[in-house]
Swiss-Prot record:
PANTHER family: PHOSPHOMETHYLPYRIMIDINE SYNTHASE, CHLOROPLASTIC (PTHR30557:SF1), THIAMINE BIOSYNTHESIS PROTEIN THIC (PTHR30557). Gene3D superfamilies: 6.10.250.620, Radical SAM ThiC family, central domain. One of its GO terms (molecular function) is 4 iron, 4 sulfur cluster binding. It holds the Pfam family ThiC_Rad_SAM. Its EC number is 4.1.99.17. It catalyses: 5-amino-1-(5-phospho-beta-D-ribosyl)imidazole + S-adenosyl-L-methionine = 4-amino-2-methyl-5-(phosphooxymethyl)pyrimidine + CO + 5'-deoxyadenosine + formate + L-methionine + 3 H(+). Transmembrane segments: none annotated. This is Phosphomethylpyrimidine synthase. It comes from Caldanaerobacter subterraneus subsp. tengcongensis (strain DSM 15242 / JCM 11007 / NBRC 100824 / MB4) (Thermoanaerobacter tengcongensis).
Length: 432
């Protein structure tokens, strides 16, 4: 049985109990929201060392880190290092997007070494292997994509991105409404190329019931991908994007009726003034399914700093109701991220998620900031460092920017605002 089926039967699973304890909410709350499909717990029955996380209504905003090999950098060992760095930095989930080297080995090693939920885009493996087996992506038999999905599910993948909303009708909208950047989703591009070449409907849409059977067998959460997400601000919230979202909403209902957990993916590149509308549209059209957004990036002119542009958009999206942020690294739009890029991407996304959680009233988020304020008031540098979202960096600055065994910081010294006001108020003297 899936987590959704257990919830519908009124059974609180061990995964639900773990999520409730982590979030500081009741087990009954988790049960009810999983039952409604407004919380998902990606937890493949074959992911043995998983510590489950909940995604959705009333929970802390979660962060995903993308890792995986490429044709230029096929070394699996590096991706395992990235996995460990991502988890240490606070990632709540990872996705293996490997397209280079032995993609099966890469996925299995990541699952084996990951305590957090692992996601994939099965179409990547299907495309890579179709080139070697059949000569091209478009020559891939329909059967092959389902074979790959079953193989990945059997390995223990907790959630899969599937571009089921790409239909012939969606492509008509894309053709009729010109974009600056037509399609920027790799999985979406592979699917569209196959559809156009073969003049056939998307197999993942046409045979959605078959996909549901596989997902149900292993309790794989479906992450309905946005193959027509905007790749630049000018293309945001257009007819093609919304047409796909409407279809995804219909598929959400089908998945829930089949007892399969489901969430929905979103953009992308979106100007600040359109982010809230995008979230509200998704929640309305997709029946309050958990919303998983890539950023969104709020300006197109900051390559090298897109972890910042995405954090800005992510904070706004999460406050508006998005539940799951996919990180963006400084290497986005430029190349495959290295280990440091992964760390910076996770931390930027965690800051965005935490800032939104404070505004959304997530109790434990506000408590962390209160603890930091008290540590600063008490001039407790060790506590401040431990409470930091990146203790390693905070400690490095404290040690290198100040003289040893000095309470004050080098920014203010004897002109410390807290010290001056404390003397006036007659309160215990502190310095910052």
């Amino acid at each position: 049985m899936t987590q959704l089926e257990y919830a519908l039967s009124g059974i609180i699973t061990k995964e639900m109990k773990i999520v409730a304890d982590y979030e500081g909410v009741s087990e009954e709350f988790i049960l009810e929201e999983v039952k409604k499909g407004e919380i998902v717990i990606p937890a493949n029955v074959n992911h043995i060392n998983l510590v489950p996380k909940g995604i959705g209504k009333g929970l802390s905003t979660k962060v995903n880190a993308n890792i995986g090999t490429s044709d230029a950098f096929p070394e699996i060992g590096k991706e395992i290092e990235k996995l460990k760095v991502a988890i240490d930095a606070g990632a709540d989930a990872v996705m293996d997007l490997s397209t280079g080297g032995d993609v099966n080995k890469s996925r299995r090693e990541i699952i084996k070494n990951s305590s957090v939920p692992v996601g994939t885009v099965p179409m990547y493996q299907a495309a890579v292997e179709s080139i070697s087996r059949y000569g091209s992506i478009v020559a891939m038999p329909e059967e092959f994509i389902f074979k790959v999905i079953e193989e990945q599910a059997k390995d223990g993948v907790d959630f899969i991105t599937v571009h089921c909303g790409l239909t012939l009708e969606s492509l008509k909208r894309l053709k009729d409404n010109k974009r600056i950047m037509n399609v920027v989703s790799r999985g979406g591009a592979f699917t569209i190329a196959w559809m156009i070449h073969n003049e056939k409907e998307n197999p993942l849409y046409q045979y959605f019931d078959r996909l549901l059977d596989i997902a149900k067998k292993y309790d794989v959460t479906l992450s309905l991908g946005d193959g027509l997400r905007p790749g630049c601000l000018e293309d945001a919230t257009d007819a093609a994007q919304i047409q796909e979202l409407i279809i995804l909403g219909e598929l959400v209902k089908k998945a829930r009726e089949a007892g399969v957990q489901v969430m929905v993916e979103g953009p992308g590149h979106v100007p600040i003034d359109q982010i809230e509308a995008n979230v509200k549209l998704q929640k309305s059209l997709c029946h309050n399914a958990p919303f998983y957004v890539l950023g969104p990036v709020v300006t197109d002119i900051a390559p090298g700093y897109d972890h910042i542009t995405a954090a800005i958009g992510g904070a706004i999206a999460a406050f508006a109701g998005a539940d799951f942020l996919c990180y963006v690294t400084p290497a986005e739009h430029l190349g495959l991220p290295d280990i440091q890029d992964v760390k910076e991407g996770v931390i930027a996304a965690k800051i965005a998620a935490h800032a939104a959680d404070i505004a959304k009233g997530i109790k434990k988020a506000r408590e962390k900031d209160l603890a930091m304020a008290k540590a600063r008031a008490n001039l407790d540098w060790n506590e401040q460092i431990q409470l930091s979202i990146d203790p390693e960096k905070a400690e490095k600055y404290r040690v290198t920017k100040n003289k040893p065994n000095v309470e004050t910081c080098s920014m203010c010294g004897k002109f410390c605002a807290m010290q001056i006001v404390s003397e006036y108020l007659g309160t215990p003297t502190t310095s910052c």
